[in-house]
């Protein structure tokens, strides 16, 4: 469907519960990333191992964010992906001053750019997360309309690219960069840790 790979109804049948847990926009654990993997020497900048190291540092903070799992119900988005975006952008809100970046241009757990979006709510509020995940799902749907032959993984990655850049749809699959691989690698880590 245009909403993703699952139909969304309010009944809580087993298929829907499974769909809500993983989200309607692809299965994170099967998605490939373009970053280098770890080798015996350990963490490499820009590697899956490096991305997961940062995700692990933020894991304690996410245990208290019940909102991440609540937002999935509204937008049918995998909570592991939401946690990964928050980890990538704000380390769970631990490194931001009153929710703003050091230049005062990006706001909240997901660091929405005020030039591209009009952030709502407080920096760590349900309203902020609903807005950010809503923007992401809109970007995914824009790619579904523009590129009907893309795979589910390309829709999700293209949506993430559009979310980060502030554009409605990605131009080509090649526009999907290392930042997206970082987010997917972190999402896989969070999926393995209960999200």
Model-flagged regions — what are they?
Residues 65, 69, 90:
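Mobile, glycine-rich extracellular loop/lid and propeptide segments
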Residues 2-46, 54-61, 73-75, 113-195:
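Non-catalytic cell-wall polysaccharide-engagement segments
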